[in-house]
Regions:
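Active-site-surrounding "flap" and adjacent substrate/cofactor-binding loops of secreted or lumenal enzymes
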Residues: 42-43, 59-62, 67-131
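Bacterial Sec-dependent N-terminal signal peptides
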Residues: 9-39
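Short, Gly/Pro- and small/polar-rich lid/capping loops
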Residues: 39-52
Length: 687
């Protein structure tokens, strides 16, 4: 129900009265006539949660997670292929399968050309001509200075050739800006071991790096030159000329003032490789005697990357060279690798549009946005009535909440220049060039634009954030809450299902909003800029926030992850702190919005009690899953995991850790004791 309708309904409800009954002398004065009671509202939606999954032999105040899904846990068997099984794991087709099946005439034309062309075909001839023309038109051969060589390289990139750099959008100063990244594309697959492949293939985008280490944003400088007292490092000056050739304003592109900062903090070996690669280019660029010759050789090697896409013959030529290359370690060209590279780097925006058009019903975006407004209102009240923050910090928090961008389902508009058109293409090589150029066109269209208008576009073109993912997330650089289609489609949201289930699943909205105020998000202001003091107006407020978050760490540290299989092994409350703050805050927000709705709709008595209990039972269902020791070690503790430990708690703690700190859970089930019981003074409230 839209927020405006809710408010109107509440106002009407508050004005309803009852006519007084006249009491005569003959009436029994000891039994006054009662006012007639309005019958309680009833849930019109379907309560589909299977209560046979519950294990009522478990005392709910000892382990609410197992109380909710314990029988299902006992009856579900893991196998060698699955260290964890989530709810709906057996539903076919899965959401991912449905997304992967989406296509249209344009996209299918590209997919049909994913093959090595016959050397004698028109496709091969067209590709060869295109390949040759790019080099001629770029001016590379005629360039006589290092600067002109790099500008020619930029022109080649604008025509579709891969570059040594990649531009990724991110939020900065309230606008969409671009950060310079390293681009090392490859169509070959190595024969190295799977464990080596996993480690090497791990990518670190600067957008993610800034989210994890926001202090690095203090070292950002425009590629064009100086910003205040900071200036672009000399070792990266060559980048400016590539951007000029590409037709992109260096003023809108950023890099780090001191890349050594990354090395010192040992963010990852992959980042260190980026630094080494950049330094190699700059070293050659400043070689007065050999720069032009050596730079041309490096560029032609990158240009030659796409040679294999011309035909079967050129693919075989490249493969023969790979076999004799000791550094290639037996790598071979793979169409699967071509497809993966294109889909990850250049197709997320097009595929996001397919998801929006073919999976999201008309009107659903607006319907869900109305619920977002309810959540904003609830969170705003919680901030205003917060007992431990000063008025200054409250104002900062409210300003940030009110400035937050709510990206739901899909962008409000699609930028035509950023959508590859394969209708006139004749070859796979041309398709690849089209994808690269349209990505650059999309970046040109959004760079410098307000985060309010184009943050969703910037994210929808990112393989880590495109619309086909089963995800919702908060982006501190844009100060945006992003709910992708998966979370507004059944079974997560369905207008026909129980009101309880829908509102409980709105904890996703509350969760992502709360991330803007967790240990990391609170360091960013309303425009998405990192500030040393964050949203805190006083040191006392920050100290109190830290004290409360430390209590939450200790709370989660006290939980046994798998009491039977791993006795004595506790959860990691420190690693998961940010997500635990968001889980607790998000559930509190969703529950309060739910109570507001119940009041408006007129729930009373036993029906009201039932609805409150079902909210928490639905929380247990949301995190229904079965996992074992292997999953706990790999995911929760990061043993053997190249990505390290997960920042999310395990499912059991995502339920038990939340309810144990919510007064409303104790009230709903009349809880007075139990292993999860925490005295009122010990229940942690942050947001």
């Amino acid at each position: 129900m839209p927020a405006a309708i809710l408010f109107s309904s509440l106002m009407m409800a508050s004005c309803v009265g009852f006519a007084d009954s006249a009491i005569g002398v003959e009436d029994n004065p000891t039994e006054p006539t009662k006012k007639p009671e309005t019958a309680s509202a009833k849930d019109p939606g379907k309560w589909w949660i299977d209560e046979s999954y519950m294990d009522k032999s478990v005392k709910l105040s000892d382990d609410f997670f197992m109380y909710c899904i314990g029988t299902w846990w006992k009856n579900t068997t893991l196998d060698k292929e699955n260290s964890i099984l989530y709810r709906f794991y057996d539903v076919k087709p899965s959401f991912t399968d449905r997304v992967n099946s989406l296509t249209d005439d344009n996209y299918s034309k590209y997919k049909s050309r994913l093959k090595w062309a016959d050397p004698n075909s028109e496709a091969a001839a067209s590709a060869q001509k295109l390949y040759d023309d790019v080099l001629k038109k770029s001016g590379l051969e005629a360039a006589t200075t290092p600067e002109d060589v790099m500008r020619a390289f930029g022109k080649m990139s604008a025509m579709g050739v891969s570059s040594c750099i990649r531009l990724d959008p991110f939020g900065y100063n309230g606008k969409v800006c671009l950060v310079v990244n390293v681009c090392n594309e490859s169509y070959s697959e190595s024969k190295r071991s799977s464990s080596d492949a996993t480690q090497s293939d791990k990518k670190t985008s600067f957008r993610e790096l800034f989210k994890k280490h926001p202090e690095l944003m203090q070292h950002l400088v425009p590629v064009s030159g100086k910003s205040g007292t900071r200036s672009i490092p000399e070792k990266l000056s060559f980048i400016k000329y590539i951007l000029e050739g590409m037709g992109i304003d260096p003023e809108a592109c950023y890099t780090l003032e001191d890349w050594v900062t990354l090395t010192d903090q040992k963010k990852s070996s992959e980042i260190n490789n980026k630094i080494a690669y950049m330094e190699e280019w700059q070293k050659i660029f400043t070689d007065k005697e050999k720069a032009v010759t050596l730079l041309k050789e490096m560029i032609e090697n990158i240009y030659h990357l796409d040679y294999c896409l011309i035909s079967q013959k050129t693919m075989e030529e490249v493969n023969d060279k790979l076999k004799n290359d000791t550094q290639a370690k037996g790598a071979e060209l793979s169409l699967q690798k071509v497809e993966k590279t294109m889909e990850e780097n250049y197709l997320p925006y097009l595929r996001s549009k397919l998801v929006a058009e073919q999976m999201v019903p008309a009107g659903l975006k607006d319907e869900y946005m109305n619920y977002c407004k309810e959540m904003i209102g609830v969170f705003g009240v919680r901030i205003k009535t917060n007992e431990w923050m000063s008025e200054g910090s409250k104002k900062n928090a409210l300003d940030k909440l009110n400035a937050m961008v709510f990206n739901v389902a899909y962008p409000d508009h699609w930028i035509k220049e950023g959508l590859p058109d394969f209708s006139k293409s004749q070859s796979l090589l041309e398709d690849v060039y089209i994808m690269r150029t349209t990505r650059q066109n999309l970046l040109k269209a959004i760079v410098g634009k307000s985060r309010l208008k184009e943050s969703f576009t910037a994210l929808a073109m990112d393989n880590e954030a495109w619309l086909g993912l089963q995800n919702a997330f908060y982006d501190p650089l844009f100060n945006s809450m992003n709910i992708l289609p998966y979370y507004i489609l059944p079974p997560n949201y369905d207008p026909t299902q129980s009101l309880v289930i829908n509102y409980q699943m709105f904890d996703t909205m509350g969760h992502e909003m709360t991330h803007g105020f967790d240990t990391s998000g609170s360091q960013f202001d309303k425009n998405g800029n990192y500030t040393p003091n964050g949203i805190w107006a006083s040191e006392a407020d920050k100290a109190e926030f830290d004290r409360r978050t430390e209590l939450l760490v200790k709370c989660y540290d006290s939980y046994d992850v798998l009491p039977d299989e791993m006795p004595g092994v506790k959860a990691d409350g420190k690693t998961t702190l940010g997500e635990n703050i968001a889980d607790l805050g998000g559930t509190e927000i969703a529950y309060q919005a739910f109570l507001n709705r119940l009041e408006v709709d007129g729930y009373t008595g036993d029906n009201l009690k039932l609805m409150k209990q079902r909210f928490f039972l639905s929380l247990g269902e949301e995190w229904r899953s079965k996992y074992g020791e292997d999953h706990v070690n790999y995911v929760a503790f990061g043993k053997g995991n190249p990505h390290g430990a997960d920042v999310h708690s395990l499912s059991k703690e995502r339920v038990n850790g939340v309810v144990a700190n919510m007064n409303s859970w104790y009230e709903a089930f009349d809880i007075k004791d139990g292993a999860l019981y925490r005295a009122p003074k010990d229940r942690i409230k942050i947001w």
